[in-house]
Regions:
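Short acidic/polar inter-strand loop motif in beta-rich domains
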Residues: 91-99
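Extracellular Ig-like/FN3 beta-sandwich strand-entry sites
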Residues: 17, 80-84
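Contiguous segments within soluble domain cores/interaction surfaces
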Residues: 4-10, 14-63, 68
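Short beta-strand edge segments in extracellular beta-sheet folds
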Residues: 102-106
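Short, aromatic- and glycine-rich surface loops/edge beta-strands on solvent-exposed regions
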Residues: 83-91
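Short strand-edge motifs at loop-to-beta-strand transitions and within beta-strands
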Residues: 71-75
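Short, charge-rich binding segments
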Residues: 76-79, 95
Length: 106
């Protein structure tokens, strides 16, 4: 599966619009590229990404083969309360990976 680098500010003020950045380390192999032997690499893409803020959905995206390797996603949320951001992504094999980050609101 993939690893992710998540950038979430540790402390913010209530009502601030916060930019969340996620870089997912993943090959996003389309299945159309030949290997050195002329066979095709098997398809291996992430098909969806979602983020929740204290269990409330705040962002979601469908990913397609045209998305480059190591997808970078950036979106904003309004900081309303101290809580946990939960990031999840699912690949072609329906394997889901989850990562969390805490955000503290002053």
């Amino acid at each position: 599966m993939a690893r992710a680098l998540v950038n979430v500010p540790a402390k913010v003020k209530r009502g601030d619009v916060v930019e969340i950045k996620v870089l997912i380390s993943h090959p996003m192999e389309t299945g159309f590229r030949p290997d050195p032997n002329g066979k095709f690499y098997p398809r291996d893409i992430l098909k969806s990404f979602a983020c929740t803020y204290d269990s409330e959905p705040v962002f979601s995206a469908e990913l397609f083969p045209a998305v480059s390797a190591n997808p970078f996603l950036s979106f904003t949320v309004v900081a309303t309360q101290t809580g946990v951001l939960t990031f999840s992504w699912t690949d072609d094999k329906d394997q889901t990976q989850v990562q969390t980050a805490k955000i503290e609101v002053e």
